């Protein structure tokens, strides 16, 4: 049984799991699912990235789980056997602590002392409502003595809409292991329709895209990120009724 905390306002109803990375496991508007809801742990185990809006830190794949920073070498857990990479870190698996909970707001935090990422920081997440919209705020505080390198992203998965548009203008080049290799491809004919508006039915697509704005439209809903993030990647998978928009703080 997954313990959840509920907040609501007007027609919005949100359920958050502290134990599952502080994730939004259900988001409804007027009784209808907006995010793909988490229904059971088997669903989460099959693919933890397409349930709600999991926090990815570091985002995307780290080749061989290895990176260097300021003269030091670091090794992350290999979480994707097929590519031998660390995929999206493990913060989304960590239990968060609820520090404030009211009818229309919840704040949770995760204190990392090296268990999920080899640097010290505190990540605070607040879910609330503003101007009849559901809002998410993320604050990361460096609690160590040195600099902290990170990429941060949200893998937000909506119930598949009838149509969508996303602000993208180029596609990142990547290798066979889905790692960016530098440079861009121009959008093809189908991808160009994603910018002006496209039906989502029967589309099978996956790619890293450069953002040229901060608002996407998913059906009747707008998804807007702050200037600290960009919308740079989206995914639909044919045969599944979901639609993913990934917002992140740096090039992936």
What are these regions (language model features)?
Residues 33-49, 74-95, 167-175, 180-184:
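Glycine-rich, pocket-lining loop/helix-strand segments that form or immediately flank
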Residues 1-76, 216-240:
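Beta-strand-rich N-terminal accessory domains
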Residues 239-252:
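Short, intrinsically disordered, charge-balanced linker/junction segments flanking boundaries
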